[in-house]
Amino acid sequence: MINAQDIKNGTCIRMDGKLYFCIEFLHVKPGKGNTFMRTKLKDVVSGYVLERRFNIGEKLEDVRVERRPYQYLYKEGEDYIFMNQETFDQHPIAHDLINGVDFLLEGAVVEVVSDASTETVLYADMPIKVQMKVTYTEPGLKGDTATNTLKPATVESGATVRVPLFISEGETIEIDTRDGSYVGRVKA
């Protein structure tokens, strides 16, 4: 149990039977009344963000989480098989627990967050930016750069990304895994 005043970004708490990560907090001391903590909490399972206010003396159940690097090996049915890079144990992780799964390639290293007491995987985070080779895209027309037009491109993981017209097949691009957006072209 922790006091509400001890909540910081990244703190994991159990509330109403659900796990939440604190993504934003503010210690508020109004001119009149009691001091409180205004927080934004993200549901680990659904990703839903809610705002919650806690009185300073309020006790909360904290959950100890572990973050470890895992390497993606292969897909088996609906599960993805990952290897713990410290113990070399292999663990299946469900598709819906992996953020940015469309950009997952064999050998990629992800950060797996698990409940330390139960060893239950809460979610797996891809790196924020990944570099991938464009495997297919329509050729851009020469001189067609007057507008900021985007075209679909398929990358080596099979995902489709909207890219500028000047990107061609075989080029390596950088992608933001949070929203699947094009970040830039990688210089060779």
Swiss-Prot record:
GO biological process, one term: peptide biosynthetic process
Coiled coil: none
Domain of life where this protein originates: Bacteria
UniProt cross-references to InterPro entries, sorted A to Z: Elong-fact-P_C (IPR015365), NA-bd_OB-fold (IPR012340), Rib_uL2_dom2 (IPR014722), Transl_elong_fac_P/YeiP (IPR020599), Transl_elong_KOW-like (IPR013185), Transl_elong_P/YeiP_cen (IPR001059), Transl_elong_P/YeiP_CS (IPR013852), Transl_elongation_fac_P (IPR011768)
UniProt keyword Cytoplasm, yes or no: yes
Cytoplasm found in the keyword field: yes
Protein location: Cytoplasm
GO cellular component: cytoplasm
Pathway in which this enzyme or protein is active: Protein biosynthesis; polypeptide chain elongation
Keywords: Cytoplasm, Elongation factor, Protein biosynthesis
A molecular function GO annotation: translation elongation factor activity
NCBIfam families linked: efp, PRK00529.1
Role description: Involved in peptide bond synthesis. Stimulates efficient translation and peptide-bond synthesis on native or reconstituted 70S ribosomes in vitro. Probably functions indirectly by altering the affinity of the ribosome for aminoacyl-tRNA, thus increasing their reactivity as acceptors for peptidyl transferase.
Family: Belongs to the elongation factor P family.
PANTHER family tied to this protein: ELONGATION FACTOR P, ELONGATION FACTOR P (EF-P) FAMILY PROTEIN
Protein name: Elongation factor P
